[in-house]
């Protein structure tokens, strides 16, 4: 099911294509699968953004061509100013065609967080496309002039639609995406409360960062 969400956002809404440069905001289960779908469809670069080092390390090993950890706002700096500064730092660090094209072709936000949406807006090339997947606050501020002047397309993506499950099954069955890798913690049904606690805390009893927690029957595997 999460893979179908990623396929719908990346393929149906984002219309990802080969050799594009793709920015993914958020390295949770959906963000990671979005990045994996982009790679499977031939994206040249897939850059994952997150604040958690362990998630970025996982993204690098799973699907990302590179990762980026944005800095927090400086004193008296607004979220949008911080996002602009981070976007410039990201483009400078990547160089190559991303900088030459003045931004990414496609950005997909899996967080719903205002700073991430703003970062996407500042990191887009002219006539790029942003797909919003994550649900955060019902209202956020975006640099609308930046989007208008650059004619950036902004689309929403909600769950999945006809054909997305078929595409997801094909990607998994052909070995193009190993969905089992994002399941970092497994719990038996009798330990369901521990599973929810780990999800809430973001870490399991073993101290590792949780990407995807699974509750299953039978013996649990760490």
Model-derived segments and spans:
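Short glycine/serine/threonine-rich phosphate/pyrophosphate-binding segments
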Residues: 29-34, 113-119
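Mid-domain Rossmann-like dinucleotide-binding core that forms the NAD(H)/NADP(H) cofactor-binding site
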Residues: 1-77
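Local beta-strand N-terminus motif with an aromatic residue
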Residues: 19, 64, 103-104, 192
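Short amphipathic alpha-helix with an adjacent loop that forms part of the alpha/beta core around
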Residues: 73-101
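N-terminal Rossmann-like NAD(P) cofactor-binding module of classical short-chain dehydrogenase/reductase
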Residues: 105-108, 131
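C-terminal capping/lid region of NAD(P)-dependent oxidoreductase domains
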Residues: 97, 101, 136, 177-182, ...
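Short conserved AdoMet
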Residues: 17, 112, 125, 204
């Amino acid at each position: 099911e999460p893979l179908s969400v990623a396929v719908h956002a990346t393929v149906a809404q984002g219309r990802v294509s080969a050799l594009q440069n793709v920015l993914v905001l958020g390295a949770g289960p959906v963000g990671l699968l979005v990045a994996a779908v982009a790679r499977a469809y031939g994206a040249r670069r897939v850059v994952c953004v997150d604040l958690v080092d362990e998630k970025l390390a996982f993204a690098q090993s799973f699907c990302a061509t590179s990762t980026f950890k944005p800095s927090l706002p400086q004193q008296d700096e607004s979220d949008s100013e911080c996002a602009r500064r981070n976007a410039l730092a990201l483009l400078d660090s990547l160089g190559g065609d991303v900088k030459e094209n003045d931004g990414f072709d496609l950005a997909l936000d899996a967080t719903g967080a205002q700073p991430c949406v703003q970062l996407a807006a500042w990191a887009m090339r002219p006539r790029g496309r942003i797909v919003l997947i994550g649900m955060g606050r019902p209202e956020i501020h975006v640099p609308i002039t930046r989007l208008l002047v650059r004619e950036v397309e902004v689309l929403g993506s909600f769950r999945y639609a006809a054909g997305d499950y078929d595409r997801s099954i094909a990607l998994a069955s052909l070995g193009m995406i190993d969905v089992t890798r994002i399941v970092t913690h497994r719990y038996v049904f009798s330990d369901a409360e521990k599973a929810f606690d780990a999800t809430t805390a973001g870490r399991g009893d073993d101290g590792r960062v949780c990407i995807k927690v699974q509750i299953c029957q039978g013996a649990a595997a760490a």
